[in-house]
Amino acid sequence: MASYAPFIKPYVQYNEHGWGPCEIPDMDVPYQPFCKSDRLGKICDWTVAMQEKKFSNKYASSFGNNSQYAYFHEDDDSTFHLVDTSGSRALKPYQRGRFRPNVRNNARVKGRSGRGPGMLGVAGSMAGGGTTSGSTKYGKGRESRRNQGRRFARNAPSRLRESSVLVRPNWVSLEEIEFPRLLKLALPNIKEGQDIVTCGSLEYYDKLYDRINLRNERPLLKMDRIVHTVTTTDDPVIRRLSKTMGNVFATDEILATIMCCTRSNYSWDVVIEKLGTKVFLDKRDNAQFDLLTVNETSLEPPMDEEGSINSAHSLAMEATLINHNFGQQVLRVGEQEPRFKFGEPNPFEEPGVELACLGYRYRQWQLGNDLVLVARCKHNGVIQGPNGEVQFLSIKALNEWDSKAANSVEWRQKLDTQRGAVLASELRNNACKLARWTVEAVLAGSDQLKLGYVSRVTPRDHLRHVILGTQQFKPQEFATQINLNMDNAWGILRCLVDIVMKQPDGKYLIVKDPNKPMVRLYDIPENSFDSDAEDEENSSEPFANSLDN
């Protein structure tokens, strides 16, 4: 019987607490995680080369640990040779005069038309974008500068604006509405407002200011009259009317800000108080809500430089004072001059204080779903129509500060001959402000919107101004010209009011985001904006005080 090899029983480890071997012998083989789908570019690489910038992760591992085995493109310098071009063959005298001017001219024609493969030899290198000195001088230098300007304009970092109010941590965000959603809203068939109470008196417009032109300019005077910008809850007439009629109360400035919010770039805020079925749209005390913006919608808005006369805040103060002085200067002021008086006196009169003559109209609108809006609107003056009728005016002023810095049309050159170009430039740079003025005129029922063109005497003097001309429009027609849809404006207001009506009684705040096209609704405590600390943080001079200085 054949002998068999002896059977040696192997040693088997027994795992009492699981399955598999209890320990792994040390084989001195390094382990590295890998993926079978990775493409191997090299077997090994002892030096790490610079990765390709455009496709740096083309052969990278999905695990990210065995990148030394990935493929990276390397230039082979073994076949690189330097070529000495200093000893190039000179052209013959008879060729130098005929050939080289044609090269330059053909290169220019080739660069302008962009046709053909280019000339051979030196001409081909120049026309085809070569690196000769001639191409750098005539074509490549200008093109690179143009591309550089466009590149920096396109990739320039966006300017971060500050919010009009400091958002507190204890404020609750209720709603965020983007402008594209608001632009789709519409509330048609809103009839013209009905007058409830009319107060104040109006002076007649001086028609001599319609004859002002560039050759007959007139200096802008400083008027000592005071304008009170009383908010909604402090208006005694609105307090009286809120007891018997209406459930939404506001002023024309607040309504215009909300209805034209999709055109605004700067931050603003509106305080809302809900008491039962009544909603009051209000503004914060000592806020910059009443300041007029300058070049808000321009491609290059004013910079926020402290101490500069061309900063955003300084220009806003200047524009507000110009608008106030112009609105009073163009009126026929005097005790012997006639006035148009409304049914009730000015509700904001104070003894010993000379107030500007303004006419206030408290009107109401039916917004549907038992929503009745009551708002205070105003007129700045009156004028006698062609048939002897009285027409109400809304008088506003556009101001020019520095046409070169503002990248706009220079008024002193084109205001008389190309007034349409000047107005188009203002519509581009101040679209939101003009839309607000138009909405205020439409809400008040003004027959005409009178615009004045006021400019600095010199660009560096922000205290002296001259009136260069005036222009008038019908508010409804001007709204059509600037593409202002009143149905959309009413829809935006109705949307925000409906959102607030669904909330419990309390205090709310609508804030325009300073850097995004959206508005936010916050639920804020009742004591917000009441403490002295809040007034110090949001300190700004009241509009009435600024007019006294």
From Swiss-Prot:
Sorted UniProt keywords: Cytoplasm, Initiation factor, Protein biosynthesis, RNA-binding
Main location per the UniProt record: cytoplasm
GO molecular function annotation: mRNA cap binding; translation initiation factor activity
Source organism, top-level taxon: Eukaryota
Record's signal peptide: none
Biased composition (Acidic residues): 529-539
Intracellular or extracellular location(s): Cytoplasm
Compositional bias ranges of the Gly residues kind: 114-132
GO biological process: cap-dependent translational initiation; formation of cytoplasmic translation initiation complex; regulation of translational initiation
Region listing for Disordered, in residue ranges: 107-157, 527-549
GO CC aspect terms: eukaryotic 43S preinitiation complex; eukaryotic 48S preinitiation complex; eukaryotic translation initiation factor 3 complex
Annotated spans, RNA gate: 288-302
General function of this protein: mRNA cap-binding component of the eukaryotic translation initiation factor 3 (eIF-3) complex, which is involved in protein synthesis of a specialized repertoire of mRNAs and, together with other initiation factors, stimulates binding of mRNA and methionyl-tRNAi to the 40S ribosome. The eIF-3 complex specifically targets and initiates translation of a subset of mRNAs involved in cell proliferation. In the eIF-3 complex, eif3d specifically recognizes and binds the 7-methylguanosine cap of a subset of mRNAs.
Subunit structure: Component of the eukaryotic translation initiation factor 3 (eIF-3) complex. The eIF-3 complex interacts with pix.
Domain notes from UniProt: The RNA gate region regulates mRNA cap recognition to prevent promiscuous mRNA-binding before assembly of eif3d into the full eukaryotic translation initiation factor 3 (eIF-3) complex.
Cited HAMAP family: eIF3d
Recorded family membership: Belongs to the eIF-3 subunit D family.
Name listed for the protein in its UniProt record: Eukaryotic translation initiation factor 3 subunit D-2
Species of provenance: Drosophila ananassae
